[in-house]
């Protein structure tokens, strides 16, 4: 089919986002944080999503159940939780539904083997087709996260020729090593389909963007048709973050009697606080007094197994403090989010763990953008990502490379010495907001308010 070469005209955007308004997840926040700026620019959105999130009342927001059994079970659990909480009714109803769907899920997995959410593309496509044929849509915008949104967008593009723009959150093709460019056909059926979908996006989308230079680079290597005539125009956008808790400026830091190193967010074997605990061993040996003065705080997630093992092996039960998820404080009335912001601003140093997998070359943690709003020093332990390293250096962060034990130990020693002298690095106030992302997207797709039909 011929590519629609005309510039984007018209403000009626159909936004396909499987996890829209879904319990604070990064895949949801990435699009929901853009909405105020899109509205301000004159966009008139209609959103299609799964039933897993909270319905938005500012504009048409249609929520559809996925048609496949695995996705139905997933969506049903979240819907029941949103409606009735996770009490006895949740346990009984979701248990019964899971039991009834088990054989059908097994059949779906055996014959297809895709991610559970794939089937949400079907209702999104059917309802999107009706809107487009009714002349109620000027542009289709798929964003994810879940690739079912992109599949629905692809079908709508092929069937109607509507303008289609694509926001890819995480790389669709996961490489295994620096030498792996992603050309090899995966054995996993879901990975194989994602590889196919990436090729289709670069061929049929009008514009497509990724969130890192690395992701754009490797997608271009695999799809040299990108940015050529009658193919997709590809570019990079930094997603940024809204000021957490309404932060608009950094506060003066008050040193306490402890050096508080704070990590916020999820942990895993490839993103583990054991990296920090291992580096504390030589620090405590060289500066014995530091053992009583250094504390590592973990907020927002359970400890990973490597961290738990390191605590046990080193006897660090008093060194690492696991706070878990911060909920609303009934005494003060502060929300969990407000409490998190307070803890971030009170930290001496914020820990940013990047990971050790190859996909780190194409990924920047969303937490990085939140950290920038706090005005606190960041200690980034990164892996194969010059773009992230450059942004950290630009802001006078402490920087180490994953796997470099000596470099990590040296950075920790520098933090200790700086703290002891009350001279921790003073980061430059250079936050990256969501507004700049929306402005770049609108500029790249050449959308102007005066073009509204």
What is each of the regions a protein language model found here?
Residues 1-75, 207, 283, 288, ...:
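N-terminal subdomain of nucleotide-sugar transferases
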Residues 192-234, 389:
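A short, active-site helix/loop in glycosyltransferases that binds the activated sugar's phosphate group
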Residues 72-76, 235-258:
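Acidic anion/phosphate-binding donor-loop and adjacent secondary structure
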Residues 271, 327-345, 350-369, 379-390:
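Nucleotide-sugar-dependent
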Residues 209, 253-271, 277:
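Conserved donor-binding/catalytic core segment of Leloir-type glycosyltransferases
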Residues 47-119:
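A conserved catalytic-core segment of Leloir-type glycosyltransferases
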